[in-house]
Amino acid sequence: MSYTLGIDIGTFESKGVIVDGDGKVVATASRPHKMLVPRPGWAEHRPKQDWWGDFVHICQAMLAQSGIDPKAIRCVGASAIGPCMLPVDANGEALSNAALYGVDARAAVEIEELDAEIGRERILAACGNALTSQSVGPKILWLRKNRPQIFDAAAKIVTSTTYVVQKLTGECVIDHYSAANFSPVYLIGKGWSGELKSDLIDFDRLPRLAWSTDIV
């Protein structure tokens, strides 16, 4: 019999499940972690400990609980909080803590700057989203302005699911739905684009685009 394993990494906890071919649950596990608040308005995770560490721990716990041969796991699904902003090196290793989704408001000044430069209505029309603390683009600009050494050293800027999938497969990939939060450099129907902001980041430093149903 073959099995499917799924893990979801959340703000304060990660959880996993293994199901058989009929959808019957054969194992579950979870693991808590902390959200770091190093400064007011900031919210961070430690990717190696909180994301990958949880993933490995939960997989091991569920395999031990079920007694399943790991080779019988035919499909792995990874879901994680997002959109987050994480600079990584060429090997996919984190260069800093990850700035989390909308609960992290460090880029408020950068949102105002991009709105003034590009135009709020233009961004909304082209991207389908206004710039908010949920947007990754302003946080990339924040990183470039406030942590230039880390920005320059980063081979890629990724989000949480990309980080985990790269650990599993070696592929640096992001699904279109997550990438849509990278405004103003992801446009509706176009993907990565410098049409609104050409000098924010080189596009070879962003993950390859794919659909959430693609196998990588």
Language-model features: locations:
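Gly/Ser/Thr-rich active-site cleft segment
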Residues: 9-11, 22, 88, 123-216
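Acidic-glycine-rich active-site phosphate/pyrophosphate-binding loop
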Residues: 27-30, 109, 212-216
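N-terminal glycine/serine-rich phosphate-binding loop of ATP-dependent small-molecule kinases
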Residues: 1-97, 125, 153, 203, ...
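A charged helix-plus-loop insertion that forms the helical arch/lid used to bind
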Residues: 93-106, 181
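Short alpha-helix plus adjacent loop in nuclease-associated cores
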Residues: 102-117
